[in-house]
């Protein structure tokens, strides 16, 4: 990962401390996915509810191993792919140390 985003293919992912789930608008970002059958919606800043099309996961290799991204919500109407800092840390047994110009994932 880089200081502000990580790239998978041509798509950037941005760390977000305010989201509970990872979010993507591109189904191709998920290696495993299933249709979302619930009625839940992703609530955004203006209180608008965005429909969830699918739920899935993917993993990302790093120099020290691999990181998993579970319960990624596929939301067609979002414009930026977001990594939930809280979920990432819980799923991977890590914490993230933020610095002015970069961040470090630690276990």
Language model feature labels by segment:
Residues 1-107:
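Anionic group-binding determinants
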């Amino acid at each position: 990962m880089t200081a502000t985003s990580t790239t998978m293919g041509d798509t950037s992912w941005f760390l977000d401390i305010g989201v509970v789930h990872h979010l993507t608008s591109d189904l191709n970002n998920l290696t495993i996915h299933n249709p979302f059958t619930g009625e839940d919606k992703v609530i955004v800043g203006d209180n608008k509810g965005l429909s969830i099309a699918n739920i899935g996961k993917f993993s990302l290799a790093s120099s020290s191993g691999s990181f998993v991204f579970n319960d990624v919500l596929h939301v067609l109407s979002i414009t930026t792919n977001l990594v939930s800092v809280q979920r990432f840390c819980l799923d991977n047994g890590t914490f993230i140390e933020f610095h002015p110009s970069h961040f470090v994932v630690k276990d």
